[in-house]
């Protein structure tokens, strides 16, 4: 795998919007029966290329969401967004989930499933085509989408690494 340039961001510096992706009721089987609690998956972002995801678990839904938001604020990354879309195609993988993301022409919109849509909207990506394969579990899909976004490379960084002009990066 090539070197991944991930720029982490401090949550206190920016204003973030939260998207609750999924809330699950989970059970722990004990001697007296089942003990129920909740887990929540949340995606946060500023709409300008910063996105993060988090998982929270608690006995109450609101507490689980709060914990997930706090966790998401600790996992913020910066994604290269060019004219509201991605710089290039990429495949993201996590566990059994595979995600294929592709840049789209202006006006296309976000063509993606529910869990992926939350990630793209939080990151401020307005035009993208995405397909999820394998696992449809929201947790795996969110992590695979974040993996694909982490692997994205900005065109100016590619040009700098190759030692060529920006026009050569796109036109060969």
Curated annotation (Swiss-Prot):
Cellular compartments per GO CC: small ribosomal subunit
Record-linked InterPro entries: Ribosomal_Su5_D2-typ_SF, Ribosomal_uS5, Ribosomal_uS5_bac-type, Ribosomal_uS5_C, Ribosomal_uS5_N, Ribosomal_uS5_N_CS, Ribsml_uS5_D2-typ_fold_subgr
GO BP term, example: translation
Domain of life: Bacteria
Gene Ontology MF terms: rRNA binding; structural constituent of ribosome
Every S5 DRBM domain range: 16-79
UniProt keywords, alphabetically: Ribonucleoprotein, Ribosomal protein, RNA-binding, rRNA-binding
Gene3D superfamilies documented for this protein: 3.30.160.20, 3.30.230.10
Reported function: With S4 and S12 plays an important role in translational accuracy. Located at the back of the 30S subunit body where it stabilizes the conformation of the head with respect to the body.
Subunit record text: Part of the 30S ribosomal subunit. Contacts proteins S4 and S8.
Free-text note regarding domains: The N-terminal domain interacts with the head of the 30S subunit; the C-terminal domain interacts with the body and contacts protein S4. The interaction surface between S4 and S5 is involved in control of translational fidelity.
Family: Belongs to the universal ribosomal protein uS5 family.
Protein's recorded name: Small ribosomal subunit protein uS5
Species whose genome carries this gene: Cytophaga hutchinsonii (strain ATCC 33406 / DSM 1761 / CIP 103989 / NBRC 15051 / NCIMB 9469 / D465)
Gene name per UniProt: rpsE
């Amino acid at each position: 795998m090539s070197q991944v340039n991930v720029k982490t961001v401090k949550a206190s510096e920016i204003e973030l919007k939260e998207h609750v992706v999924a809330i699950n009721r989970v059970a722990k089987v004990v001697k007296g029966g089942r003990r129920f609690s909740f887990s929540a998956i949340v995606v946060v972002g500023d709409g300008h290329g910063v996105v993060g995801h988090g998982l929270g678990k608690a006995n109450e839904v609101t507490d689980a969401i709060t914990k997930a938001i706090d966790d998401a604020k600790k996992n913020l990354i910066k994604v290269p967004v060019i004219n509201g879309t991605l710089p290039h195609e990429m495949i993201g993988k996590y566990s059994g989930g595979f995600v294929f993301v592709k840049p789209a022409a202006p006006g296309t919109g976000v063509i993606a499933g529910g869990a992926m849509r939350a990630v793209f909207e939080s990151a401020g990506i307005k035009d993208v085509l995405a397909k999820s394969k394998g696992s449809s579990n929201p947790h795996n899909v969110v992590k695979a989408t974040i993996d694909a976004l982490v692997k994205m490379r900005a065109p100016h960084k590619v040009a700098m690494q190759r030692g060529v002009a920006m026009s050569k990066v796109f036109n060969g």
